[in-house]
């Protein structure tokens, strides 16, 4: 009996301990539940909300690039695309295979996606394919239940309506590379593009705008159910250029078959009205995504379509440099306009012969400075160069803009080369030779200039020696256009012509005598309009009521052999293209009241006469359209926040 009682007491104690433990555990659980559901309810509601709500950045509309009259050179249009979120897929490669059965996915697109998956975080959307048709986009939407991690998206894509004709100016946008990442969250967005070349690159931050955001309700699989709220971003600023698109297009078509460059510039304000480099490329191809094969084709092209020859092509200026040598002689007092030299076609310095281009005709005979320029007598300029020395020639060249960059609103501008005695000694370790001075006097030897520099040189000759500098943007600080974009000459109480006069007043003189400038520019008029000028075949038609002044230039790319000289020089038709001389012509018009400077350089074009023929056609169009006389978008026109149609 006692044993049974002991057992009962032990059992009761165990039950009490077990019951107490259960009660304690229940109390702890109840307390924890109270803590979670009551005391911490707000915190967990917020976390639950965050799991249900997805915040997404919205790319703002990129600013437009417009010409001086408001024509769109870079715009935006609706872009149907597909993005992929790696962590939501059952396997990226498998998902791409399924997607490729619905819409076209090319090997280079697939390879790019697989590369980006490795370098990006798994929750960051990756652009798969863009610019789908509506039918393709609809097919993807129908198949979405079988495509986890795939998201159809509608955004804006960049479009270049003028294509290759303005490519070297406008540039292009392309995908963000790892080197481009700067911490701006916009750069992480799928399919986001940044400027990689031209105006698109130089003004990228201004064109880019500020991001907006969207609060989206999503389900457990991350799919969007609805948009709860949206805050639009700030559209990018528009950039208005000085270019006249109609003129640009006509010049581009005229040079389409050449490896060439042309620049048209207002001589007083420095506005670039046209800048053409041929051959060109389609900037839309870069926006869509260029294949490796297409890229190699462009890079290996013998005529270098990716290079803007107007600012990066460096050529011996040839006889277009003779005006600089003449001015250096006049300013230094070593020769006046009446200084005469007898040209028999060749001179000798030691054992070396220096020829004139008219050597096979017995030379030019007696020529003065005006005739020396008009007839492009090499012997005359050998004589001036010998009297001057290379350093005085170089000093005058630099006053006219050669040997420097201007900071124009483009990438890749080159400085060319104006040599000196010190330069040669520092670079080669060999002293300067007198023969090199003679060759410099006709624009050869080490001299190099870009077409843009030659345009600036010509503008400074024609505008009375004012140090005008080229510019490509009318509103470098961006801004919006108002209304429909039709600009007027007077906006916000400001007169555009008054602005131009103020701009002229700020330009400094290069310090060259007006009388000496007139001697040289009169000679340039005789080049085209004189009876014996080297470009007399290419004077402007009488119905234009204006005359053009200019200077031919033929730049050798290799030395003429004795056999070739004996045969009368190189015959371009019989010479391989790469060995033909470059053809140059620089001009201004109208004579008497100059406004425009034009330069044409044709690689391996044969002779300056060929470039003169092209320049005649271009200057004719310039004077007929007279872009500086027409109302353009004012420098401060418009307002921010302009709405765009896409």
Regions found by a protein language model. Give the residues of each.
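N-terminal secretory signal peptides
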Residues: 1-11, 21-27
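Short beta->alpha transition motifs characteristic of CBS
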Residues: 60, 76-81, 274-280
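Small/polar-residue-rich segments within soluble enzyme cores
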Residues: 97-101, 116-236, 529, 547, ...
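Beta-lactam-recognizing serine transpeptidase/beta-lactamase-like catalytic domain environment
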Residues: 2-5, 218-228, 268-319, 324-599, ...
